């Protein structure tokens, strides 16, 4: 295993869900000092407190997730909409705002958001979830070009059909209807392995990826290509 992340302090949010476990394992294998945090980020002051607790942060890896509601557009409640945005959207700018001063002072840093390809391709009964995921990606593109002159790279992985315990637990993967859907919709013909996704994330956290600015990279086995 390469040591391309040797000594880098990488903060991973919600490290116990979504891509958190695979990310922590892979980043550590590449030499990173992984700051695996599982704190609730919904309170408005939580992101600032988290960053202060961890001190020096070279890379902020924003891993935010919740079970995706499956609600007809005409039945989405105010509570559902608010909950999805409170969990997956509002913490993102707060985290960036909290970590930005130290990255600006060093003229160096990276932010990588683990997003969703659902924002790139329409999905039925997923309006609240895809709207939140789309907001994440729009934020990454805007902030990415703003911070690039400061040598701070902000990018996102937009994924779907990637093996993870939050969205594709074993019982889902074993469901015959899901297997047929995957064969029909995913050109790769299988789930992307968690390790494959995490290795790409590790690369984007490294100095080898300094040229990427406000980019959204689909990782979905071909389900979404742009």
Task: Set out the residue ranges of the language-model regions.
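A conserved structural motif in NAD(P)-dependent oxidoreductases
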Residues: 186-197
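A glycine/serine/threonine-rich, flexible loop-to-helix segment
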Residues: 149, 159-185
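Canonical Rossmann dinucleotide-binding motif of NAD(H)/NADP(H)-dependent dehydrogenases/reductases
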Residues: 2-35
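Short C-terminal tail/terminal secondary-structure segment
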Residues: 121, 202, 213-226
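Alpha-helical segment proximal to the catalytic Tyr-Lys
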Residues: 101, 145-149, 210
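Substrate-binding pocket helix/loop in short-chain dehydrogenase/reductase
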Residues: 71-73, 77-85, 178, 182
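Catalytic loop of short-chain dehydrogenase/reductase
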Residues: 110-135, 140-149, 161-162
């Amino acid at each position: 295993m390469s040591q391309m992340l040797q000594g880098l302090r990488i903060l991973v949010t919600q490290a116990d869900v979504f891509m958190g476990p695979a990310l922590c394992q892979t980043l550590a294998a590449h030499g990173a000092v992984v700051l695996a945090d599982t704190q609730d980020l919904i309170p408005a002051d939580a992101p600032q407190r988290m960053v202060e607790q961890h001190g020096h942060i070279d890379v902020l890896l924003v891993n935010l997730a919740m079970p995706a509601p499956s609600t007809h557009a005409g039945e989405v409640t105010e509570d559902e909409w608010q909950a999805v945005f409170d969990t997956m959207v509002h913490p993102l700018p707060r985290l960036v705002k909290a970590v930005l001063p130290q990255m600006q002072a060093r003229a160096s840093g990276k932010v990588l958001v683990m997003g969703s390809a659902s924002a790139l391709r329409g999905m039925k009964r997923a309006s609240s979830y895809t709207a939140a995921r789309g907001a994440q990606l729009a934020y990454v593109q805007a902030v990415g070009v703003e911070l690039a002159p400061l040598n701070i790279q902000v990018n996102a992985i937009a994924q779907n059909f990637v093996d993870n315990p939050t969205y594709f637990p074993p019982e889902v993967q074993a469901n015959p209807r899901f297997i047929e859907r995957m064969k029909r919709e995913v050109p790769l013909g299988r789930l992307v392995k968690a390790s494959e996704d995490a290795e790409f994330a590790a690369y984007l956290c490294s100095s080898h990826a300094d040229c990427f600015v406000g980019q959204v990279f689909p990782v979905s086995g071909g389900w979404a290509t742009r």
